[in-house]
Curated annotation (Swiss-Prot):
Identification of the protein by name: Lipoprotein LpqB
PROSITE patterns hit by this protein: PROKAR_LIPOPROTEIN
N-palmitoyl cysteine: lipidated positions: 19
UniProt signal peptide: 1-18
Location in the cell: Cell membrane
S-diacylglycerol cysteine-type lipidated residues: 19
Tree of life domain: Bacteria
Family affiliation: Belongs to the LpqB lipoprotein family.
Length: 585
């Protein structure tokens, strides 16, 4: 997994310690469905190629999906090309070994390889691990033009190195169910023409989110809306789209959205998708021949949709808080006084989080930690005010707040619960259906943290990182769906986690050499800096601008850029054994 361990951190600033490998700058598109020129770097078969070389070049050529993998089909006989089914997901493989059985005019080959991940026909990349199951024999025959593949298994196997060179990562954005922000949906695509990028991105927004997000987000660009024509420069020109000051013009048709807020969300989806992909504004957005919003007829900018900024830090004004000696304190310059009210006085607090606004607190009080008769309770109330007990159990995980101010926690290892305030003002405890998670990943859930957009839950289960969608069911309740593992390279060493942004998670671990790591939505993991940390490293709390961890001495903050050899610096007023960082989230 080291080959993919640092693929995603290039976009991070303070947190990046090195960049390599994963394609990071292209648009999503369905594999094998787009007619366009193949990238010039793809190999072609030659008469002098030996079977082994021809097979390796074939695996490289499969990296281009254009025209139903036309580049790869050049390596096949006509009969093999007519029967090869290249639809569906592709497996990304490395360390390929071919074992040949030769005859003068025919060669039979078995293939062994390591699986590094998969790429769906929507461009969704997920990391994987393990040996490639035997796909069946591959047969080559000698033709007048040299060796060609005459029989091969269905499906696509992508050479990892060629995948890196051909595919780029871009992020689509969809609206969260509350309409407060936008949700990332990373995709990978092979693209060679920069001026086609914006059109491909918008086309994929119209096509909709990946299956696991279908019931967790809203798509204001969904059917019957469609793209009228290619995205152009703001003035209608076809070259230089989104580069320099040329801007981008998007013409839509069949718009059914009439209320201003929904149109604002539609614009936010487009603008954040294009902007985060390096396609600069102004963004001229038209629907059915008229401006989407007359106020922005000359063009939108990111400032016009800043309220939905996916990189904004929730409750940033609240600042850093901490549990010190079991009570809640706030960082105030070089001091850390207890907060006023009950949370500053109540002893035995072992985990806490602030609401998204930073004005409310949810805190866990634990009696007799670790003992057979251990007891935990969840207390909720305004920061600086009184607290009310709303839930109890033997163990409760660190609380996490959703965008609708519900508090999520896990009771006694497996029972996920939402706590909300009902119409009478009393707390209501509502079970969350976590059956999909506990069936696939048995074991106690030691941590559950909701993403900043509230549509995903990241969990620590038996030391593994597990991601699931947060889906509201027809009856109004919630379920955790589509669980999958992230960060195979981390093994089973995770202790705590926190969302830094909607696309990446900070993880503390039991590994002294790499006590802090990062993992993104694709599942790619990378090691963070370890300088000045002492084991064990416990709770982590993060937001887009800061990462705090607790080690045996107290709370430390990640500081310095990648060029400055980043390390961990002490938060002096919070250097107390057992202190734990607390942020909104």
């Amino acid at each position: 997994m080291r080959r993919i361990a640092a693929l995603w951190l290039c976009a991070l600033m303070v947190f990046a310690v090195g960049c390599a490998g994963v394609p990071s700058s292209s648009s999503p598109q369905a594999i094998g469905t787009v007619d366009r020129p193949a990238p010039p770097s793809l190999p072609k078969p030659t008469p002098a190629m030996d079977p082994d070389v021809l097979l390796r070049e074939f695996l490289k050529a499969t990296a281009d999906p254009a025209n139903r993998h036309l580049a790869a089909r050049q390596f096949l006989t006509e009969s093999a090309s007519s029967t090869w089914d290249d639809a569906g997901s592709a497996l990304l493989i490395d360390n390929v070994v071919f074992v040949e059985t030769r005859a003068p005019e025919r060669v039979s080959v078995t293939m062994r390889a390591d699986i590094l991940g998969s790429l769906s026909d929507m461009g969704v990349f997920e990391t994987g691990a393990g040996a490639l199951p035997d796909p069946g024999p591959i047969e080559l025959v000698k033709t007048p033009d040299g060796w060609r593949i005459d029989r091969l298994p269905n499906g696509v196997f992508l050479d990892w190195q060629q995948f890196q060179a051909t595919y780029k990562r871009h992020t689509l954005y969809f609206a969260d169910p509350t309409g407060k922000t936008v949700v990332p949906d990373p995709r990978y695509v092979a693209v060679s023409e920069p001026d086609q990028l914006a059109t491909e991105l918008v086309s994929k927004l119209v096509a909709g989110p990946r299956p696991e997000m279908d019931k967790t987000v809203r798509n204001l660009l969904g059917s019957p809306l469609r793209l009228r024509g290619p995205v152009t420069r703001a003035d209608g020109g076809k070259t230089g789209v989104g580069r320099g000051y040329g801007g981008a013009r998007v013409d839509l048709e069949n718009l059914s959205t009439t209320d201003p807020h929904s149109r604002q969300l539609l614009a936010a989806q487009l603008i954040w998708t294009l902007s985060r992909s390096g396609i600069n504004g102004p963004y001229v957005l038209n629907a059915d021949g008229a401006a989407l919003d007359d106020r922005f007829a000359e063009g939108w900018d990111t400032a016009d949709v800043a309220a939905t900024d996916p990189g904004a830090a929730d409750g940033a004004a609240a600042g850093l808080h901490a549990l010190v000696g079991g009570s809640l304190v706030r960082l105030d310059g070089q001091r850390a006084p207890r907060v006023s009210g009950q949370f500053g006085q109540m002893p035995g607090q072992t985990a806490a989080s602030l609401s998204r606004t930073g004005q409310e607190v949810a805190s866990i009080v634990t009696l007799r930690p670790g003992a057979p008769d251990m007891a935990s309770s969840l207390w909720v109330g305004p920061l600086g005010g009184n607290a009310s007990q709303v839930l109890d159990g033997r163990s409760l995980t660190r609380p996490s707040w959703s965008l609708d101010d519900a508090i999520w926690t896990v009771v006694d290892g497996n029972n996920v619960v939402r706590v909300i305030q009902d119409a009478s003002g009393q707390p209501a405890r509502i079970p969350v259906d976590a059956s999909a998670v506990v069936t696939r990943f048995p074991g106690a859930i030691a941590e559950l943290q909701l993403s900043r957009d509230g549509t995903r839950a990241a969990m620590v289960i038996e030391g593994k990182i597990v991601l699931a969608g947060v889906e509201q069911t027809a009856g109004g309740n919630y379920a955790l769906t589509y669980p999958r593992r992230l960060g195979y390279g981390l093994g089973e060493t995770a202790v705590s986690l926190s969302w830094r942004t909607g696309d990446d998670i900070v993880v503390t671990r039991t590994v002294a050499q790499s006590p802090v790591s990062y993992v993104n939505l694709d599942g790619v993991n990378s090691d963070g800096p370890s300088r000045n940390l002492l084991m064990p490293v416990k709770t982590v709390a993060a937001n887009p601008s800061a990462v705090y961890v607790a080690d045996g001495r107290g709370i430390l903050q990640l500081s310095g850029s990648a060029a400055e050899d980043p390390g961990w610096s002490e938060v002096r007023p919070l250097m107390s054994a057992g202190a734990l960082p607390v942020l909104p989230g």
